[in-house]
Amino acid sequence: MKRIRDLWVRTNLIKKIGIGVVIGLLLGILLPDVTAIGILGQLFVGALKAIAPLLVFALVVQAISHQRSGQQTNITLIIVLYLLGTFLAALVAVIANYLFPLTLTLNTPVNTELSPPQGIVQVFQTLLLKLVDNPINALATANYIGVLAWALIFGLALKSVPSDFKHLIKTAADVTSQIVVWIINVAPIGIMGLVFSTVSENGISILSDYALLILVLVGTMLFVALVVNPLLAFALTHQNPYPLVFRCLKDSGLTAFFTRSSAANIPVNLQLCEDLGLSQATYLVSIPLGAMINMGGAAITINVLTLAAVNTFGIQIDFLTALLLSVVAAISACGASGVTGGSLLLIPVACSLFGISSDLAMQVVGVGFIVGVIQDSCETALNSSTDVLFTAIAENAFWKQKKA
């Protein structure tokens, strides 16, 4: 028994989740009437739902309050590239939804009452009202728009407090993140319950929907990595970007794929920047910063799954509303750094724009965790490799401008 326990502890989370998916699939086929197994999935989603608002608030407050000013000139360009790249990735995901519309099978009645927005004006009205929600109520009701807004305000207000108090804020954020790590560590069991419920209630054919979802997610990320990002690089450097793109994907993206952590991949990226001959003063700032705010892969995940939920509930949206979703997804994605499955936990932020309740949004998050074995690896590979890519092309453009 001890040998089995030690083997389980040594096995990485990706393999554990894969095992959970397989076991849940087999149990759903062989023992579909043992509904108690599905409770494990409900408990897992419930725990995530409980901690997610506090997690978003703590991380954003900590990041804003510790933000440093007076960065170098090309750091500004890198930040612009990070934000622009994240927005473009979100926009590509919206276009992918129009080309390959997806629907999800969720455990909710067909006649579930929703309050879909009536165009861009109502979306803005809803957004503004959620911005000024009571901060305690925003946390209690999972109003993520209000949580983000108040976290930004608190973070700015705390920038001038003594360093000891800032350390306390960081400790609170670290504690919250650790709780999430504990919850994520039982993800294989929770996902087993989710897969069991899905298969036992809907049959084995439901897996074909997940296969299509994975194809759209991974295909969109590949398009951004191999088309959108190279176009940005060419626009700034007027040089063939693909040698640099492939170097970043090989030396940074490959390791990030397996670590599934932009933060864990920072040492790899720093070494790659040194090998590329980039300015140390630049990449020592831009690489850790990119691990926090350069989240194109996360924006893709948020948009693809949110729009799949929108399609599932038959909510009609115009392109301007979808464009606003891209902005919200880009901003929300910046809060996904440093947390396993962070992009999935921010899906309710986007879903709330369309009147989709937190309960239903967390079911979408559950679907995300089922496909997360592949999605999270590809997402991290895109995010982390792009940190080096944008740092390199920004420095190249900066020195070309100085020489001119």
UniProtKB/Swiss-Prot annotation:
GO molecular function: amino acid transmembrane transporter activity; symporter activity
Localization: Cell membrane
Record-given protein name: Serine/threonine transporter SstT
Tree of life domain: Bacteria
Physiological role: Involved in the import of serine and threonine into the cell, with the concomitant import of sodium (symport system).
Main location: membrane
Keyword entries, A-Z: Amino-acid transport, Cell membrane, Membrane, Symport, Transmembrane, Transmembrane helix, Transport
Gene Ontology BP, a term: threonine transport
Family: Belongs to the dicarboxylate/amino acid:cation symporter (DAACS) (TC 2.A.23) family.
Reactions this protein catalyses: L-serine(in) + Na(+)(in) = L-serine(out) + Na(+)(out); L-threonine(in) + Na(+)(in) = L-threonine(out) + Na(+)(out)
Membrane-traversing stretches: 17-37, 44-64, 75-95, 138-158, 179-199, 212-232, 287-307, 319-339, 354-374
Signal peptide coordinates: none
GO cellular component: plasma membrane
Record membrane topology: Multi-pass membrane protein
